[in-house]
Amino acid sequence: MEKIRVYQLAKEIGLESKELVTTLQELDISVKNHMSTLSEEEADTVRELYTESSAKDEDNKDETSQQQDEKQEDKKEQGTTTDKPLVAPPITVGELAEQIGVESTSIITKLISKGVMANINQNLEEDSLEYLAQEFDFVVTQEEPEEDEKSEEDRIIEQIRSEEPKGEPLERAPVVTVMGHVDHGKTSILDSIRKTKSIEKEAGGITQHIGASRVLYNDKTVVFLDTPGHEAFTEMRARGAHVTDIAILVVAADDGVMPQTVEAINHAKSAGVPIIVAINKTDKPDANPDRVKQELTEYNLVTEEWGGDTICVSVSAVQNEGIDELLEMVQLVAEMNELTSYPQNTGKGTVIEAKLDKGRGPVATVLVEDGTLKVGDSVLCGSTFGNIRAMVDDRGKRLKQANPVTPVEILGLENIPEAGDEFQVVPDEKMAREIAKKKQEKEREEKLKRSQSVSLDNLFDQIKEGEQKELNIIVKGDVRGSVEALRESLLKLNDNEHEIKVNVIHAGVGTVSESDIMLAVASNAIIIGFNVRPDPNARKAAEREQIDMRVYRVIYEAIEDVKAAMAGLLDPEYKEVVQGQIEVRQLFKVSRIGTIAGCYVTDGYIRNNSYIRVIRDGRVIHEGNIKNLKRFQDDVKEVQQGYECGILLEKFNDLKEGDIFEAYTYEEISPDV
C-alpha cells in the first residue's frame, strides 16, 4: 500500500505541517513529526474529516475566547485592597524600621538568619526586602518615578522596539547560515544554490556580493548569509544579534565529522538554532553517508530515518544533486517555526557587514528583519546614525524601499557600524544624532568599567549580581581521551542539591583558536586548555575581550579550580562565634544620649561591630548592636579581657548593674562542592 508523509499531505490540503500533526494526534493517528508516514486509508480519513473538524475547532476557539474575556472582566471588577504598610525601594534598614514601627535590631536579626550581613545605614536589596515583607507583613511597591531614571534615548529606543504591530503578520523568509569543517563544501553548496536558484535567474542582473543573498524556490524566498562558517555567525551573536533562523551543517561523506564540524554543532546548539545536516560529496567513490550519520549520533544529532528528529539530506554540490530537497527541507523547518513579520511597522534589523568605500563613504549591509526601510529614513545604527541616501539589493538594483528579510546595502551613515549592530528607523535625524552621541559616551564609560566577562576569580560576585547559578566552559585538549576525561570530570561537578549547573558547551581537540574566544564571548564562558596553548590571534582576542583562559597540565588542578569557583556559587552558611563576656558594673544616665554601661571584659574581647546579647538572671532580655564603644573618652575598635570600657547600646537603655553582655559575631562557612 502506498504511503505519504505528513508534510506532503499538509501541502496537498493547504495546511501547515505543524497544524496537521496536531490534528492527526487529536484523531488518534500515531505520528511524531512532519516526516512521519501515513497509510492511504489514514490520508483519506484526514481528507474527508478535516473540513468538519476544523469548523469545530473554530467554534471552540470562539467559545474559549469569550470565556477568557469574561474571566478578565471579572478580575478587573474584583480589584484588591490592603491595610498593610507600603514600602518603596530604595530604603535603608533604619528607614524601614521607622516606617513599619519595629526595632532595627529585629530586622538585622532576621537578615542574619537568612545569611545577609547588614547595618542600620545599609540599603536593602530587592530580594532581602521581599523576604522582610513576608516576615513583618508589609507590601513592597514599585514606584513609577523609576521611569525618570531612564535616559531620554533609552525611552525612545524602548518605545520604538516595543511598537505595537501594525496590520496583519505575514509569513517571512528564513535566514540561513551554512556551517561545517574546512574543505567540506560550504562555499560549493552556496554557489550551487545561487547558480540554480538565485532571484537574478528569474529577473536578470548580476549578483552583488553584499553579505547576504536571496534565492527563490517553490515561489518562496530563502535568504542565505554569504559568509559561510560559524566564526562570523558567533561573532554577530557575541554582539547580541540573533539573525540566523536555520543552520545547514555541511559534512563531507568521504571525511566524516571533523573538529570544526563539532565546533559548528556546539555553536548552533548554544544559539538554539535548528540544524539541517547536508552530507556533501556523495558522488565520490569513497563516500560513506552511513558512517557520517553514525558519527553525528555522538553529538545528539540522530537522523529521522534512525528514529531521531534531525533532518539529513544527501547532496552533491558539484553535480547539483539534492539541492532541491535541501531547500525544501529549509522551507519545511521555516514553516514549522512559523516565522512572521509586520511590513507596516517602522524598519528595524541587523547589520550583516560594513566597510568604508572610497567613493561612497561608510557602507553597511543590513538585513531588514521587521517593518519596511525606505530611502530618506533617519536611522540609528549601533552607536552611529544617518539618513539613508540610497539602497542597493543583492542584484545591484537600486530600491526605494526594502521589505522584511531583504538584505540591502545602505549609504548615508556617519560612521562605520559593526557586524551585529542593531539598526532602527527613528523619527528624525536630529534625534538619531543625539541618541548616537549618548550611546557613544555610554560605550566609552562601559569600557572603563570592570569587564563583564565571567572568570573563575570573579565568578561568585557576578553570580550574586545576576542571580544565576551556571558556569559555561569550553574545553580544548591535545588528544580526544584527555578532552573526554576532563569533560566528564567537569560534568560530575553538577550539584543538583544546590542547583549549580556546569555546562561544557564545547569540547574539542587542538589549540585554543580565535573561534573559541568568540564562542566564549557569545556564551559568557571560560576556556580550559589541557596540554595545549592558545595561538597568537586567540591570545590577543582573549586579552581584548577579557576572556578567562586557563591552561593546565594536570586534570586534577583544573577540577580543583572549578570546584573552588563553584563553592562560591553556593549560598553561604553562617555560624555564630562568641567573642567575649562583659559585666555591667556601673550605669551612667546621660540626657539626650541614653544609658552608658560602665563595663569590665571578663572573658575574650569585644569589638565596636559586635552583636550584643543582654543576659539577666540567665535569660536573654535583648539582642542588638553597639552604638558606641569607649575607653575613657576615646572611641575604640576593640577592648580585650581584663580591661574596662564604656558601652552605649543602640535603642536600649533598660539596663541594671550585674547584667552580662555576650559579644558575638557570625562567620561565613564556605560550603563543600
Curated annotation (Swiss-Prot):
Pfam families: EF-G_D2 (PF22042), GTP_EFTU (PF00009), GTP_EFTU_D2 (PF03144), IF-2 (PF11987), IF2_N (PF04760). Its main location: cytoplasm. Residues 171-340 form the tr-type G domain. InterPro entries: EF-G-like_DII, EFTu-like_2, IF2_II, IF2_N, P-loop_NTPase, Small_GTP-bd, T_Tr_GTP-bd_dom, TF_IF2_bacterial-like. Residues 280-283 are annotated as: G4. Residues 226-229 are annotated as: G3. Residues 205-209 are annotated as: G2. The keyword Manganese does not apply. Residues 44-78 have a biased composition (Basic and acidic residues). It is found in: Cytoplasm. Residues 180-187 are annotated as: G1. Signal peptide: none annotated. The keyword Protein biosynthesis applies. One of its GO terms (cellular component) is cytosol. Keywords: Cytoplasm, GTP-binding, Initiation factor, Nucleotide-binding, Protein biosynthesis. GTP binds at residues 180-187, 226-230, 280-283. Residues 32-90 are annotated as: Disordered. Belongs to the TRAFAC class translation factor GTPase superfamily. Classic translation factor GTPase family. IF-2 subfamily. One of the essential components for the initiation of protein synthesis. Protects formylmethionyl-tRNA from spontaneous hydrolysis and promotes its binding to the 30S ribosomal subunits. Also involved in the hydrolysis of GTP during the formation of the 70S ribosomal complex. HAMAP family: IF_2_B. This is Translation initiation factor IF-2. It comes from Natranaerobius thermophilus (strain ATCC BAA-1301 / DSM 18059 / JW/NM-WN-LF). The gene is infB.
